[in-house]
Design a protein with these regions (language model features):
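Residue-level signal for inorganic ion chemistry
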Residues: 5, 37, 155
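His/Asp/Glu-enriched, well-ordered alpha-helical/loop segment
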Residues: 18-123
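C-terminal cap of metal-dependent C-N hydrolases
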Residues: 108-159
Length: 159
């Protein structure tokens, strides 16, 4: 049995006084799952945790001081929105050795329907302008409870 890392970016920043080297962990093929630690952050949203993972990786890469760009930051530490989404879904399943996070026979069907047309939704996706990656970024950045129109957990619709 192996080990894995449960990573809550905001909690890590608050309590470890540092940003977790996520890019390096991924490059070493470590099992990392993204989590939302309510006691360590303001929102219990996995979308918010994914946005934090991307934001923190960009801060690590760009640096936090006023030195000239090539004298600050940690090169190649960026994590993409696609990677953050993977960490929030299948990465968590791999870390916990659970069959979750991907749509595949034998895996639990856990899913959300994000509706950009519902009242209160802040998600705006334009078929003629947004690529699939653009749409994913918008979902991660802008999804709040009003945009979630349906929820399935272990194959059972609960909303």
């Amino acid at each position: 049995m192996g080990a894995g890392i449960a990573h809550c970016p905001l909690s890590n920043m608050y309590f470890a006084d540092a940003a977790f080297p996520l890019r390096e962990a991924l490059d070493q093929d470590l099992h990392v799952g993204l989590g939302s630690d309510l006691s360590g952050g303001p929102l219990p949203s996995i979308f918010h945790a994914a946005l934090d993972a991307v934001s923190h990786s960009r801060v690590r890469e760009a640096g936090t001081n006023t030195h000239i760009m090539d004298q600050r930051g940690e090169a190649n530490s960026r994590v993409s929105f696609v990677e953050a989404f993977w960490l929030a879904t299948h990465g968590g399943g791999l870390t916990l050795d659970l069959p979750v996070g991907i749509f595949k026979p034998g895996y639990y069907f856990d899913a959300l329907v994000i509706d950009s047309n519902t009242a209160g939704s802040q998600v705006r996706i334009y078929d003629d302008l947004d690529s699939a990656q653009d749409a994913l970024e918008k979902i991660i950045v802008h999804t709040t409870e009003p945009a979630i129109s349906a929820v399935w957990v272990s194959g059972k619709q609960i909303k």
